[in-house]
């Protein structure tokens, strides 16, 4: 038994299933067989929007990396089936994941063959280390082979595994330009995972990706920028994107994006996404964000909360957005 290959950068990576992976696969198979028949049929054509607009269901989710210290309900093999079920219920079309190790991403992709994937392991640019990856529905979007990739948030962004600015670990951002089959519009998607300790690193990381994006997206096509920023809404790294306020060491302001949850729920006090496996709103922090172009209309935005057993130590963040030509 083997898992599929991951990422367009990866050479032929076959995955031999361990006993624990076999248990996971049987659980996922049971979940898939339990779906309604119409959900398992071949993808159907999507009606073209009369006004050329593009409505998209977005989500970002830090998976919590698989490790031997977390057992029982927190073990990956006991969480993955719930995650796949949640993604099916939420009808997610574009998903940004963080912290997923190679086996975790393979488990998800094997259970979601209707999705394409973009991403690499942060340690070697292939399959070692955590992924900051992007899943997208292939029946809805086509990926632009010339505009996709990953960069390391460092002084040497093309060097796999590189780190600078006091990063505790290699950090990276992944992007892909998608073409919407229903409207013909292009959509740039960026997924980022910033450092959890070093503030200068967070600020320099978003600036680096912003510069890269400005070089690629010269036509100012619609943009989604999501991820685990390890920073709240008032943090300079986040405000650089949301308000166009220059971050430390930057002489140029970013054009500014809409933070989807804040757009609809500016005064909601229970907005934490990082919960540390605890049901205590006073000890939860909103570090996971979905940003979109200012021209977009945010139709819905919410934190997908669930009781125990938790899917991760982060709550997923969901947004439904309409982009207009």
Q: Which ranges hold each PLM region?
A:
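Bacterial N-terminal signal peptides that target proteins for export
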Residues: 3-24
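Bacterial N-terminal signal peptides
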Residues: 23-32
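N-terminal, active-site-proximal structural segment of metallo-dependent hydrolase catalytic domains
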Residues: 32-111, 124-130, 285, 325
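Structured beta-strand-rich core segments of catalytic domains in phosphoester-bond hydrolases
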Residues: 43-50, 94, 98-186
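Active-site beta-strand/loop signature of hydrolases that rely on acidic residues for catalysis
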Residues: 56-63, 83-108, 135, 176, ...
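Acidic/histidine-rich helix-loop elements
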Residues: 60-81, 153-168, 195-198
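Short, solvent-exposed loop/turn elements at domain surfaces
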Residues: 65-73, 97, 144, 199, ...
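Active site of divalent-metal-dependent phosphoester/diester hydrolases
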Residues: 118-138, 154-158, 164-170, 220, ...
